[in-house]
């Protein structure tokens, strides 16, 4: 079973493309969705997060306050590193377990890992490069990313720009891409690209 690593900057349309690939039969493991799972009420990361940051990092329902954590992580590099040390190993463990289950079932034509920080983690012990056959980058202009995130999440422009600045550059993602979907235009231009890659991934 071919294994695809799908990535792109915030607001690039990763989730939308992953959903369309899933509709076409792909097994999809979304690391961002898993990140939400482990920081939900009773999630696997909650005890360690409280130990590291205190109970004030939780909402009233017991979930991690994502807005507060995001603001802290992007203003304090030490806090960001501490957060990643807690969450990244858990996310990776669960992702690989679900991916292995999909591969063992052989019920899908190919497997897609959705990894927002795939390019940032290409080097080192926890690189995704050795785990995927092809890297698929969802690409769009940076200004388009920023506008989409502001419209979707209602975040201040300065915070969105800070998030974008701390991610891999557009050029860095394109440099390692095996396949690229251009999501800078209309929806009508996006779907044929998804169909083309779906057929290509099935053929191997």
Swiss-Prot record:
UniProt: ATP binding residues: 11-16
InterPro entries attached to this UniProt entry: Depp_CoAkinase, P-loop_NTPase
Enzyme class: transferase
Keyword Kinase: yes
Name of the protein in its database record: Dephospho-CoA kinase
Database matches in CDD domains: DPCK (cd02022)
Keyword Zinc-finger part of the UniProt annotation: no
GO CC entries: cytoplasm
Pathway(s) the chain acts in: Cofactor biosynthesis; coenzyme A biosynthesis; CoA from (R)-pantothenate: step 5/5
Molecular-function GO terms, alphabetical: ATP binding; dephospho-CoA kinase activity
Function: Catalyzes the phosphorylation of the 3'-hydroxyl group of dephosphocoenzyme A to form coenzyme A.
Gene from which this protein is expressed: coaE
Catalytic activities: 3'-dephospho-CoA + ATP = ADP + CoA + H(+)
EC number(s) recorded for this UniProt protein: 2.7.1.24
Residues covered by the DPCK domain: 3-204
Family: Belongs to the CoaE family.
Cited Pfam families: CoaE (PF01121)
Broad class of where this protein is predominantly found: cytoplasm
GO biological process: coenzyme A biosynthetic process
Keywords: ATP-binding, Coenzyme A biosynthesis, Cytoplasm, Kinase, Nucleotide-binding, Transferase
Cellular compartments annotated: Cytoplasm
């Amino acid at each position: 079973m071919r294994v695809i690593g799908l990535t792109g900057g915030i607001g690039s349309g990763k989730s939308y493309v992953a959903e369309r690939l899933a509709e076409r039969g792909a097994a999809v493991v979304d690391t961002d969705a898993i990140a939400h799972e482990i920081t939900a009420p009773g999630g696997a990361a909650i005890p360690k997060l409280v130990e590291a940051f205190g109970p004030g990092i939780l909402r009233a329902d017991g979930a991690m306050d994502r807005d507060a954590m995001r603001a802290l992580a992007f203003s304090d590099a030490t806090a960001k590193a501490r957060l990643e040390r807690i969450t990244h190993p858990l996310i990776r463990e669960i992702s690989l377990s679900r991916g292995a289950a999909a591969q063992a079932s052989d019920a899908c034509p190919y497997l897609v890992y959705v990894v927002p920080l795939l390019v940032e983690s290409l080097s080192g012990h926890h690189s995704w490069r050795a785990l995927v056959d092809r890297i698929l980058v969802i690409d769009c202009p940076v200004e388009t990313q920023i506008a989409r995130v502001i419209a979707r999440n209602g975040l201040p422009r300065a915070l969105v720009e800070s998030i974008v600045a701390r991610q891999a550059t557009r050029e860095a993602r394109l440099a390692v891409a095996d396949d690229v979907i251009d999501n800078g235009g209309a929806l009508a231009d996006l779907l044929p690209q998804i169909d083309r890659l779906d057929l290509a991934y099935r053929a191997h």
